[in-house]
Amino acid sequence: MEQIQVELGVRSYPIFIGQNLLENSDYFSSYLQGKKILIVTNDTIAPLYLAKVQALLASYQCADPVILPDGEQYKTLSQMDAIFTSLLAQNMGRDSVLIALGGGVIGDMTGFAAACYQRGVDFIQIPTTLLSQVDSSVGGKTAVNHPMGKNMIGAFYQPKMVAIDTACLHTLPAREFAAGMAEVIKYGIIWDGSFFSWLEQNVAALKSLDEAALTYAIAKCCQIKADVVAQDETEQGVRALLNLGHTFGHAIEAEMGYGVWLHGEAVAAGTVLAAQTASKMGLVDQSIVCRIEAIFEAFDLPTEAPEAMDFEQFIKHMRRDKKVLNGKLRLVLPKAIGQAEVYGEVSESLLQEVISRA
């Protein structure tokens, strides 16, 4: 079992990583004693893990769970209302704990509900997808989508702990696993070139769900994320680097319809577009772009924008990106494998050239 600490002063919290973590209630006891618990999950995860978690927490006060429909298209304010209704109907107060049992959508919605309910109650993340284990469950970003943009309504609100059971990945569909790998690869590109090289050398081990390889990769990603969040919790500086590929990627998700492209698929294509932009600007050699494309392809991820999207469809969403400052687009672009930077002087004509050739 690995343990990583997210250092945020009095709001610091642990990330536990290990196989069959959901068979040991000791990890949870100090966060649940004397609390009333509401588990929030979805209709895909509930048949797989809800009974297991309920059995794990049998000695605590558990309310009736909330089971939401599965999918990015349901990450909305109207669906989040079901969480609030359940909390109120079961007379749950400020001593409540919400448990997010699921992937990134469930984690984001549960965290946002916890931030809002009675002006803030505790919550715990139990991420069940690779993407949520390496990225969205750590760092306190919570949100729902709006038809005009992804994650536009939300808050920074940290969990009390994160419990990552690698055994959950054995029930994850291959497409979802690949989508999670997009975020894993991102860490290598922006932060750690040696980790990127390790990923290139361990494609087969990761795709076969080798336990040692998985644990190493997840722990490496969580440690990088914890270090970045400790430096810049609310994304005023270095944390923006974690958005590599996301400006293009969020545009793909919003334009194609939430859930048509998985988040990780959109990030993969978006990262290649970012790398091609960096190459056009003379920031990286074309050989770097080729390495980035090759590793995404090795994990069965898209490396091109949707044929159905043109420049105007991209740019209308990109102009709403949360990194826009004084009306100017700001893009995270790679400078090398293991290094990235935020650039605020990227011309739309250059972006049009990159997108048109994609």
Swiss-Prot record:
GO biological process: amino acid biosynthetic process; aromatic amino acid family biosynthetic process; chorismate biosynthetic process
CC cofactor note: Binds 1 divalent metal cation per subunit. Can use either Co(2+) or Zn(2+).
Binding-site residues for NAD(+), renumbered to this chain: 70-75, 104-108, 128-129, 141, 150, 168-171
Annotated metabolic or biological route of this protein: Metabolic intermediate biosynthesis; chorismate biosynthesis; chorismate from D-erythrose 4-phosphate and phosphoenolpyruvate: step 2/7
Top-level taxon in the UniProt lineage: Bacteria
Lineage: Bacteria, Pseudomonadati, Pseudomonadota, Gammaproteobacteria, Alteromonadales
SUPFAM superfamilies reported for this sequence: Dehydroquinate synthase-like
Protein family according to the UniProt entry: Belongs to the sugar phosphate cyclases superfamily. Dehydroquinate synthase family.
Gene from which the chain derives: aroB
UniProt protein name: 3-dehydroquinate synthase
GO cellular component: cytoplasm
Annotated Pfam families: DHQ_synthase, DHQS_C
GO molecular function: 3-dehydroquinate synthase activity; metal ion binding; nucleotide binding
Cofactor(s) recorded in Swiss-Prot or TrEMBL: Co(2+); Zn(2+); NAD(+)
Keywords attached to this entry: Amino-acid biosynthesis, Aromatic amino acid biosynthesis, Cobalt, Cytoplasm, Lyase, Metal-binding, NAD, Nucleotide-binding, Zinc
Binding site for Zn(2+): E183, H246, H263
Reactions the enzyme catalyzes: 7-phospho-2-dehydro-3-deoxy-D-arabino-heptonate = 3-dehydroquinate + phosphate
Main location: cytoplasm
EC number: 4.2.3.4
Compartments (UniProt record): Cytoplasm
Biological role: Catalyzes the conversion of 3-deoxy-D-arabino-heptulosonate 7-phosphate (DAHP) to dehydroquinate (DHQ).
